Amino acid sequence: MSTADFVFIESKDPIFLDLQAFCTALREKFPGILIIERTNPEKAYSLSWDYQIPQLTLESSLSSKKNVFVIDYFDSTNRLQDYASYIIWLRKWFPPEEKVSFCDEGYEYVFELPSDLSQKELENYLRTRFDE
């Protein structure tokens, strides 16, 4: 992937996302991950993480308002399946009843991510968007 993708919640209410629980889950899912937390409220992103192993490389961040996950880079051996799994995993951090979407940097491709979306459904969407 050469451009960023986003998983975002469409809510006007403040978002509660337990950063400690999220960081713990990141460390469990991706052992050895590098997590950088920023405490400056003027920064656009409060958290960023990088992970690199031979089978998977990813770079992501969380907006300071905790309403947008940014996927700056993602590549893996099983890219389509792994990317769909990662997007669904990020979606689970937002309340299931809220409208959450996935889009590209240019907001050209927007795909709703209902909480009960299957990985196979997301893979089918991604297949239409990315060349394998």
Locations of the language-model features?
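Short, extreme N-terminal segment that most often corresponds to the first beta-strand
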Residues: 1-31
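Weak global preference for isoleucine
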Residues: 9, 15, 33-36, 53, ...
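Structured domain cores in non-transmembrane regions
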Residues: 30-59
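Generic detection of short hydrophobic beta-strand segments and adjacent strand-loop junctions
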Residues: 6, 45, 111-113
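Charged interaction segments
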Residues: 50-132
